[in-house]
Amino acid sequence: KQAVAFFNNYRVTDPLALNNAAWNFFLHVDNKKHLESAIKWGKQSVAIENAYYNNDTVASLLYKAEKHGEALKIANKALRIAEENGEDGTETEKLIQMIKKAQNGN
């Protein structure tokens, strides 16, 4: 609750701090309203630094929030960035498969 208040009320400009907060919510939070806040932080992180790590976080959060269409779009973007920069996108590839299964009702 305190993290939500902090990140929603103060202008945080460090993309890594925003991403880390968002990722921790992905790992530990199921409350839809709080997930929406984390998605917002992740998107703010991407707006500051469009990188693999934070696009993957946003895609993961969108998947958890059951926004599969947008999650797939962002996951594919993250994977493209990883490939362009020689980063390992294995976890995002797994996420893409999970999103596709969810879209198909599996």
Predicted regions, residues:
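Structural helix-adjacent loops and short alpha-helical linkers that scaffold large soluble proteins
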Residues: 32-36, 65-73, 86-89
